[in-house]
Each structure stands twice: as structure tokens, then as C-alpha cells.
Amino acid sequence: MQDQYILALDQGTTSSRAMLFDRLGNIVSTAQKEFQQIYPRPGWVEHDPQEIWSTQAGVAAEAVTRAGMNGTSIAAIGITNQRETTIVWDRETGHPIYNAIVWQDRRTADFCDQLKEQGLEEKVRAKTGLPIDSYFSATKIRWILDNVEGAREKAKQGRLAFGTVDSWLVWNFTKGGLHITDVTNASRTMLFNIHSLKWDDELLEALDIPRSMLPEVRASSETYGPTKTTVFASKIPLAGIAGDQHAALFGQMCTESGMVKNTYGTGCFLVMNTGDKPIESKNNLVTTIAWQIGDQINYALEGSIFIGGAVVQWLRDGLGIIRNAAEIETLARSVPHCDGVYLVPAFAGLGAPHWNARARGTLFGVTRGTSSAHIARAALDSIAYQSVDVLKAMEADSGIRIGELRVDGGACANNLLMQFQADILGVDAVRPKVSETTALGAAYLAGLAVGYWKDVDELQSQWKLDRRFTPALPHAEVKACLDGWKRAIRAAKAWADTP
């Protein structure tokens, strides 16, 4: 396998990306293309599935060409993707019968309430690890079957195929030869039993979704089959699939029970590897499958924060306090601390572990001495505080004391935020050299399947440290900071609950 590389396809919510990795896990070339966001009604979010495919195929070819290579240089392809986003297509034509309904879409919220009223919540959580929510794929499939003309009849005839974005890409890369998904994506549908590792007939019946629509569920790292498209002249093994947060956990090499990563993006996604047994959360976290390699399954606890880096965008676009995101660190550093100011950025409610949809953004502790720098500091602090709330819930659920926090995503470049995160969590925040951990995770899963890398131990040895942030704030100050945050959260909830 001299001079061969792994191609990782990272199909995200706003863009399709492709990256070529070498044997040491270094990025050799990249390509990226944004695509259209479709908002037919308030609360509805859609993508054009054909555009998802065309942009992803385009950047795959571009990344390889940019590196001066062709398909013969690629040992395998790994796919990682935005999760839960739902596509239904006609098996005979290969054409979608409706746009992709995106994970953010809330059109099925009322239907989810009906399912809860029927008493299904406990059963769904016990089987799938998930709460009943429009976030997940199941109710989106049901909406398409109920609202697209002729869909129900075609489904009964076995003509319709459902897939998350990974399934759609594999279907197109193999010209309809493979209709598959992996366990991580299946575990986000609200239809997959994470204990038996099978589609759940009882849930399919409750939601009136024909089993014939569903893809075959495979491991996250195995050779599924070769590409058959004209994107590449030669056939390349498709060999790794994982949802974006699962791939990031693997790319961060959080392969042991109790290891945790936090991706600081627009929101924050915190995931803890819990080993070979699923842990049912008592603290409003989601239980999910981390990945499957061979027969080995790893489970995870996950907590999502709605507003992470988005709070910095609000300071820029909403308040005009900063001109660009990079300025926030300089402004926030100009004061020694937030001076008692707390920002609860519940612009769209509060996510894990609070799950309060009615809460709204609130600013506390403001005096005549409060400056834009204090507000900037409070905004950065809020990202760290929300992360601590989730991490403490993970510790409570798992009974595992977190040893360190591995960090990635755009906002982890902010040294002030990372230091404060370490301070109030009381453990090191560790930033890797390769920041593209999601794509790297997909590459690793594919490379393992084809023997490009020998085993996980070899991958562990590749993980390189950029910077370690060690707690430095005295315990009394940490306690005072956290007590103030808890008061702010209580007050924000009280504001939401007061008529």
C-alpha cells in the first residue's frame, strides 16, 4: 500500500467536505462546498438530497485531484455525516420523493406530543436510549408517508427506501447496489433497539412505518463494497461510516470507558465513551452507540448544548460589541473576570441537562460599572458553564470521574475559554494538533477496515497534543463562580415559568 491515502467525506449541515489523510493522520488535501438551506415555513428546515449528493461527489473528486492523485491512490473511503436528517427515495428511479428533512426541523413537534400522551416515552427511551423528539428521524419518516402524495402506497409496495445522509451517499456511490447504514446513525432514528442491535418491530408498528423501507445495519468499520460511480475511474472500498459526533469521539481517540470529548461549534456536543454497556441516563442525557468495530460495540452518553459559539455570533451581529469572532478573546481578556455578570444564552431554550424549551436568554448582575468587556467575558464563560452542567450529569450517570476533557471545534482555539473550562471543571482541557477530528475519525474507521492501520493502538500513538490547559483557579473562586451560575440558571427558569 505504498503511497496510498484514506479519503474522508464529511457531509455537514451547511457544507459537504472531503479530506485526504496520510498514514500518520495528517491532512494532505481538502475541498469544501456549501449548499442551500431551505426554509419552507417557520420551524421547517430542508435540504435538496440531489444537491447533497452532487456537492459531496464534487468535493471528493476535487480533494483527490488537488493532491495530484487519482482513485488508485485511495485505499478506502470513510463517511461521516449530519445525523437524524431524513431522506426517502424511490428504489426504482433513485429519486427522492421529498426534500431531506433536516435534524433541526420541528414540524413534527405536535405529533411527538401525541406519542407522549399515548404513554410511549418510557418504552422509546428504554429501547432506543432517546427521548421522543422531532430531532430524531422516526417522526420525519412518518410525516413524509402521511403528507407526500402516493408515498404510503409506494411504501406498501416496497418501493420506498429511507436513509440518513450516510445511506443516501452510499446508495449513490454504489448506483443503488447498497442500501445500508451503520449502528451509530441507526441509533439516532428512534427506531433502533440499542440492546438487540436490530430495528424494533414494536416501535415500527407504533409509528406505522414499514420495515421494508429501512436500510441494513452494519458495523462502523467494515468493507461494505466498492464504489461504482464515475466520480472515480477505479473502484474504491467504502469501509467506514459514523455520525459526526461519534466520528469526532473516535478521531479524538476516546476509546476507553470514561473518556470524553467536547466539540465547540455553533452549539456544543459532549460525548462520553461508556464502554460495552449502555447506561440509561437519570439526568436528561441521551444514551447512544459510540461505534461498532468488528463484534465490539461501544456505547456513549451524549449531551447537546444549543448555544455555544453562537453566543459569540450574537455579540457580533446582534449587539455589535465585536467586529469578528476573533476579537472576543482580546476584549474579554481586558478585564480580570466577569465582575458578577452572568449571561444565560437560552436564545432557543436550554438543552441538556435542563431541557427547558421556554427559557430565554437572560443577563444577570449588571451594574453601572458593567462594560462590553464584562459581557464578552460572561458570554465566553457561559459556554464553559453549560459544558460543566453536562459533564457533571455524565459523571452522575456513569459513576466515572472524568480524568480530562478532549476538546475540538472552532471555539477551542480560544485559549481564554479553554483555560476557564479547565478551571471550573477541575480537570485538564486537552487540545489536539489535528482539529478536524470528525473527518479524521471517519478516516480511521475506514483505514482500520482495510488494514491501512493495524489497530487502535497504532492510532492512539498518532494522537498529538497541541496544548494542555491545567486548572489554576483557587477552589473558593471556582465555587463562587459555579454558585453564581446556578443562581442565574434558576432565575432564567423562573423567568420562563412566570406568566
Swiss-Prot record:
It comes from the Bacteria. Glycerol binds at residues 83-84, 135, 244-245. It holds the Pfam family FGGY_N. ADP binds at residues 13, 17, 266, 309, 410, 414. Disulfide bonds: none annotated. Pathway: Polyol metabolism; glycerol degradation via glycerol kinase pathway; sn-glycerol 3-phosphate from glycerol: step 1/1. It is an enzyme of class 2 (transferase). GO terms for cellular component: cytosol. Sn-glycerol 3-phosphate binds at residues 13, 83-84, 135, 244. Keywords: ATP-binding, Glycerol metabolism, Kinase, Nucleotide-binding, Transferase. It catalyses: glycerol + ATP = sn-glycerol 3-phosphate + ADP + H(+). InterPro entries: ATPase_NBD, Carb_kinase_FGGY, Carb_kinase_FGGY_CS, FGGY_C, FGGY_N, Glycerol_kin. Inhibited by fructose 1,6-bisphosphate (FBP). Its EC number is 2.7.1.30. HAMAP family: Glycerol_kin. Key enzyme in the regulation of glycerol uptake and metabolism. Catalyzes the phosphorylation of glycerol to yield sn-glycerol 3-phosphate. Belongs to the FGGY kinase family. This is Glycerol kinase. It comes from Paraburkholderia xenovorans (strain LB400). The lineage of its organism: Bacteria, Pseudomonadati, Pseudomonadota, Betaproteobacteria, Burkholderiales.
